[in-house]
Amino acid sequence: TAPAHLQEETMEGADLVADALGRINRILHRAMDGIPAETLNTQPAAEANSMSWLAWHLCRVQDRHISDLLELPQLWVADGWHAKFGMAKDEKETGTGHSPAQVEALRVDSADLPLGYADAVYERAKQYLATMKPADLDAAINEPQYDPLPTVGVRLVSIISDNIQHAGQVMYVRGLLERQGWLGV
């Protein structure tokens, strides 16, 4: 079917979020499909992140927050993605604060692994967003460490902000390593 903004219906906030997350998923595929593992795992500088690490981290952030909003276990554990990546069964592990050694330790044999995880978390996000009503975006999230409490809408914008930055970094690292110009999106 056509995207919501091309249909006769009014586009809602959740439709915008779904569109943004879909674009992020396509950026990852465009940047990583067919790229050799050596390139995916290369850190362009000693303390820089590899394409594989950036894609993994992007997915972890999206999986964690969407799963929290759904009040469901993260796909990271529920679908065994942690084992596929050879990592601990730890839902709090998203890569934030990783040392250069931890970044270097995350290795993939092909783009299939991070892209498979990206597709899985995006599908979950789409399913969640398809159930939303406009008022749902204004619902407060019970996270008392924040004042004011964040809303579902604020959390979704945070996911987009984080993910679009990291998707752009994946594209940038690919350009650095392959010494090619902008691929576009």
Q: Can you name each region flagged by the protein language model?
A:
Residues 88-139, 157:
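Acidic/histidine-rich alpha-helical segments that form the ligand environment
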Residues 18-29, 39-97, 123, 140-185:
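Short, contiguous alpha-helical
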Residues 10-18:
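N-terminal leader segment of winged-helix/HTH proteins
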Residues 1-10:
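Short, Lys/Arg-enriched N-terminal segments with co-localized hydrophobic residues
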